[in-house]
Amino acid sequence: MRKVLFVFALCASIATAHAGGLMTNTNYHIAFDRMFARGATTEIDAVFSNPAGLAWGHEGWQLSLNFQKPWQNRDVEIDINNFLANPAAGNPGATFHKKYNGEASAPIVPALFASYKKDRWAVSAMIGIVGSGGFVEYDEGVPMFNVPITAKMYSTLYQKIAGTPYAAQADALARDFILDSSMKGKQYIYGGQVNFTYRIIDCLSAAVGFRANYYDGYYKGHVTAMPGQKISSMVGNNPLMDLQLDCVQRGWGFTPIISADFHMNKWTVAMRYEFRTKINTENDTRVLTIGLQGASGYSVTDVKAMAEQNGNAAVIAALSAPDKLGDMAGKMTDYLPNERVRYDMPSLFVAAVGYEFTPGLRAATEFHFFDDKNAKMGGQRQEKLSHGTYEILAGVEWDINEKFTVSCGGQHTDYGLTDDYQQNTSFACDSWSLGLGGAWNINEKIRLNASYFCSLYSDYNKKINNAYGTPYTVDKTYSRTNNVIGIGIDYRF
């Protein structure tokens, strides 16, 4: 039954592999991508960045349609000394080094903005991908699966072969299996936001709004260990182990938003606060099975069917027996049918200052604080952060003439990461981001924006003793790259 425990523990780890992350996006409009510090803007992108600032925006209707194409790598590199060492067989093991390449991408990401202003009043709305946002795939699996399965398969086969006439070859034969593993997942939070803005006095405005958020995610993966040609005659042609998972999670949440803007002469000072958004997703578990080679041959356990027939609580209780999963059974909960898993979006505080040096030269600085430690994640992962996310932004914009504008900006992000927070398929790295781009005023009504930005991440190094239930120490490096290009059209009626 130890093998069953091990495989169920792997299944549970899938639950947290994508269970969290720092969930909020801020780049919806191309003006952000090319300048970053947009918290004091009064243009159409203020629908998100500074709703109160629309009190000084364009009189009448304006629309904006934006498209972005991001691409990113999320890589995990590991080193293990004396891997699969077996002193009893005279094998000291070997140094194992591998880089697991995770390709993260999203299709063309659109965002639509609209606003209408009349005198002191403005009403505005936007639709976009407001959180998470992307797809990641590890074609060769991830070390949290591959390392312990490799170690376990070797140990199990060695013990089994050691009691046969092939005992002298047990060390070599126990390595004769083929591991096939892959992991992929998706997380999108779609949002629709509405704001109401009022200029209270000539230099001060306020806005209230709310955003409806729809979370749509899935987690799919498999880990299959097949016997090699040398040992298939001993164990048959069925898998030594086969784990399959397909789980979809969906849920809703609503975000109240308040903002204020002080605007006098060349200065703009703005603040915005978004309240924490509770998103409680419900599982649609489509596949959750485990196939194992046992004393009586190969058999498959349909964990999903067990839960649907007997209820999730009964399944957890049964799996908690000492000869089954024991204390690990509780970690299965996040994947069982109809269970609920939290993916809260944190509260967000924004303060920004903008200054107009000349009618054609503007600059801004901005501060963000995401209270991630109080936004619940699956497995209470938020408690493992040392603090919420801090961001410092700055940008400058210059009108070359009436037709063309150029801008650039930067952003530094500090997530408050710890070793316990980082996971193979859901990890973060502190970063510096740089963006640039421009705008072309095609005529009095139409403006074309274009941008490019990249994020330069700091590698995160982590040492794990007795990693994944094995006797090995794993040195792990998390690394990321990120690039985004964008284009958008602003239209004033």
What are these model-predicted stretches?
Residues 15-135, 453:
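N-terminal, post-signal peptide beta-strand-biased segments of exported outer-membrane/organellar beta-barrel
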Residues 20-37, 41-42, 109-110, 117-493:
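Outer-membrane beta-barrel porins/channels
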Residues 4-13:
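Sec-dependent N-terminal signal peptides
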Residues 5-6, 36, 65, 277:
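Intrinsically disordered, low-complexity segments enriched in glycine/proline and serine/threonine
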Residues 9, 57, 458:
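Active-site-proximal flexible loops/turns
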